[in-house]
């Protein structure tokens, strides 16, 4: 957990990534929005949260995907768009890298829909 010395702008960035994970954020966009140098954002975010802002965003998207995969019948294409991927292929690749199985396999194993 970040210490009390964590700069407030980093907590703000993390909150924005949590709430707006479907938006195609990049370091450039974060720099524009928060008026902090992107290299500083990358360095300090990683320092306090133990992963880069983009890795954090990806993890948040995967978490949302897992919820949608197990609680809805939405197609993979639909889910990938909803959580912010520009293509289902990128989503599937990202999901598999994170979870070691495809979204379809994850759904088969963990679906809460009977």
Task: List the model feature ranges, each with a label.
Residues 1-25, 31-36, 56-74:
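A short, Lys/Arg-enriched amphipathic alpha-helix from helix-turn-helix/homeodomain DNA-binding modules
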Residues 23-60, 80-105:
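Basic/polar phosphate-binding segments, predominantly the helix-turn-helix DNA-binding elements
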Residues 112-114:
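Intrinsically disordered, low-complexity basic tails/linkers immediately adjacent to helix-turn-helix/homeobox/MYB/SANT
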